[in-house]
Amino acid sequence: DYEIEGNFRLYCTDVSLLLAMRDFGLKQAIVEGTLTGNTKGGLYESFVADALVKSGHALHFYRNETTKREIDFVIQGGGYVVPVEVKAGRAAANSLRAVMRSNEDIGLAYKVADANVGVSEDGVVTVPHYMAMYL
């Protein structure tokens, strides 16, 4: 696979400003812990994108049109391609695991989720959201 120059995603690099641009209902849902769906996922993706950029990473993403699989971020670590999947909750990272199975060159992958630090049998390293800045 290769990079397509005109294919990109935009993220707000200041999550506070992103929240300030939204209505009060969003802020209330965050405080009450009732935020759900694509809004919740998009907010967590923006937070992780901000952390990765501030850690010096260039942001790329992966999408396979045939299998409909997407990886939220692809960064470089130690000269290797490292996929990073962001989950707002504890959901499984099926796309991440499928990409790892189909590409033996990927030895390290991260799942950023509402979970503790851990490593699965297939080599996916899970880190909590607040540790995204350390990837």
Residue ranges and their predicted role:
Residues 127-135:
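C-terminal helix of von Willebrand factor
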Residues 75-83:
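Active-site beta-strand-loop-beta-strand hairpin of nuclease catalytic cores
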Residues 11, 60, 84, 110-112, ...:
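Hydrophobic/aromatic beta-strand patches that form the interior of the parallel beta-sheet core
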Residues 88-127:
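Catalytic cores of nucleic-acid endonucleases
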